[in-house]
Amino acid sequence: MEFEKLLRLMVEKGGSDLFITAGVPPSMKVNGRVMPVTKTPLSPEQTRETVLGVMNEQQRRDFAENHECNFAISARGIGRFRVSAFYQRNLVGMVLRRIETNIPTLEELKLPEILKKLALTKRGLVIFVGATGTGKSTSLAAMIGYRNKNSTGHIISIEDPIEYIHQHQGCIVTQREVGLDTDSFEVALKNTLRQAPDVIMIGEVRSRETMDHAVAFAETGHLCLATLHANNANQALERIIHFFPADRHGQVWMDLSLNLKAIVAQQLVPTPDGKGRRAVIEVLLNTPLAADLIRKGEVHELKPLMKRSTEQGMQTFDQALYQLYTQGEITYEDALAHADSANDLRLMIKLGSESDADHLSSLTQGLSLEITDDDPAGRRFR
């Protein structure tokens, strides 16, 4: 199949990634699942020809020298793609990631309403966490899009790579890509405050220096949005503190208690029909009580606080999974498979079912059954 047809098929099917590797057919990832798009495996020669064919001369020289090359390509009438070319077992391969220009909305993603409030907040640090491929970048793009439509100001993003292209709407949106527009996150962040930002988005916090910048931006009155690899809010705080030496831990806990706005953790769970995935969201808000626990480093006390603070907009993964299961959005098996505590969620579902049954029983007490002529089934409540 021609390479351009592969790209077009990827877009039509809603694929996120296209894999070109010798020995297997061209494959794409759709809704988190990798599937072949042809039956014929690619030969080493076909793979090499395809990979080198999307590069310019400079990129070919860089690839020959470094055995790695990252760049973007545009296909007219199809879209833009981020390319990562590499060698594996002395053979050439590449993965293409589709760069989205259609930013999904918070409503389309069915994300909690509290994210709208967080998107418009004036200052503070909001951290999205989750494993690779859990939709952090998509949710963050939706928040940026909401801010862009409903506010004014200057939004600066530093990403590696840029995954969504934002158009200027209410805000001016400056998007800088590491490796193309700047040498590193650290270099870009050092100069960001000179560019009069209102919102700063850091594609990924990978180091102590980047974390220092994120906290400093919040301290100086900016809204800083960032992503971090962690499974839930508690793990995110533990990961942050371990960026720093022990003699700084007390100060870091204090800084987080004063400047953290929220930690939003995310998973993706398949829908019952297998045709899509639903975001499952955990939300920790830095309320006065949460700030006090963070300042003391009592991370283990945050989960119980989240459980009893749903009216303020907080929720745990297990509470979110319970809601999605009761709404028929996910299956029982998938809910348990993604739970922080399968036993707790199982009990929550059991108690919820018993509560519903008790409520129905109380409603029907004292009612009598009467068969009427227009009720052939004989089961109308009077």
Curated annotation (Swiss-Prot):
Keywords: ATP-binding, Cytoplasm, Nucleotide-binding. It holds the Pfam family T2SSE. It comes from the Bacteria. Disruption phenotype: Mutants are hyperfimbriate, retain surface pili but have lost twitching motility. In a mouse model of acute pneumonia, a decreased colonization of the liver is observed but not of the lung relative to the parental strain. One of its GO terms (biological process) is type IV pilus-dependent motility. InterPro entries: P-loop_NTPase (IPR027417), PilT/PilU (IPR006321), T2SS/T4SS_dom (IPR001482), T4SS_GSP_E_ATPase (IPR050921). One of its GO terms (molecular function) is endodeoxyribonuclease activity, producing 5'-phosphomonoesters. The keyword Nucleotide-binding applies. ATP binds at G133, T134, G135, K136, S137, T138. It is found in: Cytoplasm. Gene3D superfamilies: 3.30.450.90, P-loop containing nucleotide triphosphate hydrolases (3.40.50.300). GO terms for cellular component: cytoplasm. ATPase component of the type IV pilus (T4P) that plays a role in surface and host cell adhesion, colonization, biofilm maturation, virulence, and twitching, a form of surface-associated motility facilitated by cycles of extension, adhesion, and retraction of T4P fibers. Functions as a PilT-dependent retraction ATPase, providing a functional coupling between PilT and PilU and an optimal mechanism for pilus retraction. Belongs to the GSP E family. NCBIfam families: pilT_fam (TIGR01420). The N-terminal region is responsible for proper localization to the piliated pole. Homohexamer. Interacts with PilT. This is Type IV pilus ATPase PilU. It comes from Pseudomonas aeruginosa (strain ATCC 15692 / DSM 22644 / CIP 104116 / JCM 14847 / LMG 12228 / 1C / PRS 101 / PAO1).
